Amino acid sequence: MDFDRNIFEVRQSRRNPFLVAHRGVSGANVPCNSMAAFQIALHQGADVVEIDVTRTKNGKHLVFHPGKEPVFLKSCPIPEMTAAEVSELCLLNADSAPTSYKVPTLEEVLTFLKGRAYINVDKFWTDVEGISRVIRETGVEKQVIVKTYTDEESLDAVAKYAPDFMFMPMVRGKDDVTDTLLARGVNIIGTEVLFSKETDEVISDAYIRAMHEKGLLVWANAIVYDERDVISAYHTDDISLSKDPALGWGWLCDKGVDFIQTDWLFALKNYLENRRKEN
């Protein structure tokens, strides 16, 4: 993949959306956000690998979803531990049994993915300055996609510490920030759209068309991380696998989104390849 090329141009040269591996590809004995999960994501053809970032109490950035310590480590929160203490722990598998996999550092993951896929750094807003520093030190500025909420504090931090990084604000239901950000001097490449209803502005044909006319991309999520938080109007991985992929992944593709984030990368890729042959 040519990371020197404008990502909108890369998307225009493709028929299918970019495939985003949520926390890598995990399951069974392979924990999410582990080096094995990221290796599998590459093997299965991920265009983008999504990672989560947290920080120890002595300031070391690790790849782990904040707040998930009771699930994946059976420990106290990582921000209450030193990096050395975390390094003694093993990630747990789907049956809560310990594995040989450790919590990787942000440097390890970025170095591993360097030159191999786009990298979506989630939880970027928790420490824009510090995470940006690690991104620059590892030399992956051109392949990293960062996202934040649309509060002024987060947007100011992006403008100050990461104005050159590919940036996507997360918008829910409607978009009140894109036009402002275009004039703000940040490298906005599109939006991550969260929508509970098919009638929401951010998934309308008019919105997606207008974004594309501006040279901007639209990121949608098929993942279900909490059934109580509907972020794709039920056009999800779950319905794609349990009923009909046309109701989930196919619907998102037909809307014209440019990224689909999934927990079932291989199945989504296989569906899109077969769909292309049929069309």
Task: Specify the residue positions occupied by each region the protein language model found.
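Phosphate-group recognition and catalysis centered on beta-loop-alpha active-site segments
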Residues: 1-279
